[in-house]
Amino acid sequence: MIQSGGAKYGSLLDAKASNDENNPALWGQVHNGRKGPNPWFPFRDSRILLAQLPSHVSAKDTEGRDDPAGRQVLLGAQAVIAALRGTFHLDPVPHLMRSYVPARDVGLRRTGENLSASISVLADREPNKFRRLNELVRLVADHPVRSLAVAQSNLRDVMLIIQEGNAPDEVTPARELSDGLLRFLAIAVALLTADRGLDVDAGSPLDAQVKARVLLVIEELENGLHPSMAARLLSLIRETTSETGAQVVLTTHSHALLNALSGDGAHSIVVCYRDEATQRSHLARLIELAGYAQAMAQGRIGDLVSEGRLVRHEESSADPGAVLHLLGIE
């Protein structure tokens, strides 16, 4: 949405295919907030259109003065690009985390393969977050853990190790850690460093003006994790999202994980279901499903889902009568 003064205009950019069969370009109409018809520009069809806008629109007019309309267009485009660029799909692959990695490779990658380097820089630069990571590991590990540490090779490559007991030689290197613990560590590090410790593309000087944030996506959070680990991560998500400003989207089929959500947590659950009539998938908020209030009075979310309840949108998206009945005011 473009705004110029008190007036608001439609979408930022409308595109259509070229009528020239010999020209594969797209034509885009830029809604710039100025008086008169909106200009049309040619765009390459092999690149995102919004990223090409700076070639056609400027924040300065022909005399070098600030152009508020042009700046609005560029800021709108940058807001969308920053949101796309900031989407970080974390898919930890434990067997890739068991080798030495260059110490300078610190931005956590989507596979978690450079976890050791990320933890190394966390220990050096953010001791408070490193301390929290240690506390989490002690809570979920099935053996006594003194501290996380990093071993360094002669080539200055690093590998994560866990120090156990009091003897200096009681250590377990990353190559011997369980898949579940490595996956847990990768997710925890991503959450703790979501504001500046992930391997996302470099931003633009305009990002600060559009308040760009990271969107961390984790599919099947419970995979390879003991239910207690998953519950700890849920608590960490609640804490870190307010600290880092990041948004987190999780997918899950775990009843135990759903049971760990309580209070306001239910308001953030979205159910994905397939409409049998149309064979299309739909999304609906859990609290908007018919019968939600009555169902929640009879059990926990995960238990209800395992019984086949609260898994699809039936008829009505509101159930005020059930709420009044539960409150005893009919």
Locate the predicted segments by residue.
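Electropositive, glycine-dotted interaction segments
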Residues: 1-139, 143
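Phosphate/dinucleotide-binding and metal-coordinating scaffold of catalytic cores
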Residues: 65, 174, 209, 323-324
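Short beta-strand micro-motifs in enzyme catalytic cores
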Residues: 88, 156-160, 268
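Residues embedded in well-ordered beta-strands within globular domains across many folds
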Residues: 88-91, 149, 270
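Short, surface-exposed amphipathic charged segments that create phosphate/polyanion-binding patches used
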Residues: 104-105, 162-163, 285-290
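Conserved ABC ATPase signature
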Residues: 114, 131, 138-142, 146-228
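C-terminal lobe/lid and adjacent interdomain/linker elements of RecA-like ASCE P-loop ATPase modules
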Residues: 140, 231-330
